[in-house]
Curated annotation (Swiss-Prot):
GO cellular component: cytoplasm; cytosol
Organism: Yersinia pestis
Binding-site positions, Mg(2+) 2: D112, D115, E277
Keyword Cytoplasm appears in the UniProt entry: yes
Predominant localisation class: cytoplasm
Magnesium among keywords: yes
Subunit-structure text: Homotetramer.
Alphabetical keyword list: Carbohydrate metabolism, Cytoplasm, Hydrolase, Magnesium, Metal-binding
Protein name: Fructose-1,6-bisphosphatase class 1
GO molecular function: fructose 1,6-bisphosphate 1-phosphatase activity; magnesium ion binding
Lineage, top ranks: Bacteria, Pseudomonadati, Pseudomonadota, Gammaproteobacteria, Enterobacterales
Family statement: Belongs to the FBPase class 1 family.
Matches recorded under Pfam families: FBPase (PF00316), FBPase_C (PF18913)
Record HAMAP family: FBPase_class1 (MF_01855)
Listed pathway(s): Carbohydrate biosynthesis; gluconeogenesis
Amino acid sequence: MKTLGEFIVEKQLDFSHATGELTALLSAIKLGAKIIHRDINKAGLVDILGASGVSNIQGEDQMKLDLFANEKLKAALKARGEVAGIASEEEDDIVIFDGGRAENAKYVVLMDPLDGSSNIDVNVSVGTIFSIYRRITPFGTPITEEDFLQPGTKQVTAGYVVYGSSTMLVYTTGYGVHAFTYDPSLGVFCLSHEKVRYPATGCMYSINEGNYIKFPLGVKKYIKYCQEQDEATKRPYTSRYIGSLVADFHRNLLKGGIYIYPSTASHPQGKLRLLYECNPMAFLAEQAGGKATDGVNRILDIVPEKLHQRAPFFVGTKSMVEDAEGFIAKFPDEEAK
């Protein structure tokens, strides 16, 4: 049995220039995940369920657990000294860490502390998403938004933690995707899936079909394609949509499938956040042999202009994403209604 800590140190030895700072940073994320895991498991017994009465910069109601997870991760990252600051879906602006080694720290972290938190009241899987970049601004100076507004190709590490029937941490540093399952009796994450790859073909599609009338024509046509009978392509595909990006992505990664959150008239740029959700998941998908686009363009090539920028998102088994892109290219004329 190999723990996450042992695995990271082992991989660090493959690089003579490694300083151990990224290893320490991942250890902080691991600690934050353990704390969130603990409190999610007793969420119905203590007063951390439901809305907080506060809205974020997008005007969305923040759940109590959103704020709890944000504060715990922020504290864990600040305490280590390897992080100059963070950007979070739950924060209006970047958070600059002061004191200690922060001004000379190499890295910045972007995160969605608790994805799918609206599901927590009904005991549905939720997750934490994180993305790590090297800072751009000079050492010894405060970081700025410039350090965070980098394309996804610049990510050093990305990953997520899914809190479900078991808690699992999945991450990549650009050398494959690896997954670790949490053993609460030992308090450690143990390697359970090494070098995870998407199956060559997929048979699941994940999209909120309740919004079908609002979708662009190409997306509607692709959904109908997924539902048609065809033995050669093993259609119809199975529809599976949890409403938690991490949970839907995780299932499709292991089983083969596509996750879609397209543009609509009410959300012409899509609804998912490019920096906190799309980029880290796109990095993981590509490292696992999958594909991630906005329907036309590679997600990781998009140069962000603002912290809370949104994007349409198509991610999963490469052939399925390419099929969806084909329908979008073939039926481009009808705008989302």
